[in-house]
Amino acid sequence: MKRLGSGARVALAVAVLAAPALSAWAHDGRRDRHDESQVRRGYEIVPKGLKLNLSEKNRALVGLGSYIVNSSGCIDCHSRPSYALGGDPFQRQPEMVNIDQYLSGGRVFGPFKSANITPDHAGKPAGLTRAEFLALMRTGHDPKDPQGDVLQVMPWPTFGKKTDRDLVAIYEYLRAIPALPDNPKPGP
């Protein structure tokens, strides 16, 4: 019996993960080629070694959310350091995302620190309900902050222009990633 090469194994794994997502997308009635390719790519770019919890999640939305989160630089602010030791592409090293602190916050910008956006004990990203998350992304106001305050570093004016479906997909992906405590070593 012929053995599969590593590239073929990766392609097979992506196909196995993406197939249920694409099937769910098709049954949702909102299927188009662009969305399918983003869902598929989303599963391809989940950081190596990161285990997603897909139980009771919409797999198509998780894939789309991964595509948006992992292609939009979210780790640059919400993971510190962004890359694992020896995995910094800016140092011409093969990219390896720091999954030990993946999206657990801790990047300091003057008086501001990026939030831990992994799920809390109840499975809510950053402790926010879906409605609170969408409102934060549209208005920049974190419901945990005093009324009138807006996030000063988070590019919410840009993310707020995304469709509701895109923002729900981000939320669904964040629900699927492992919960982590706040980054124990905040810094620039």
Region locations from a protein language model:
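Bacterial N-terminal signal peptides that target proteins for export
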Residues: 1-12
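Bacterial N-terminal signal peptides
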Residues: 11-21
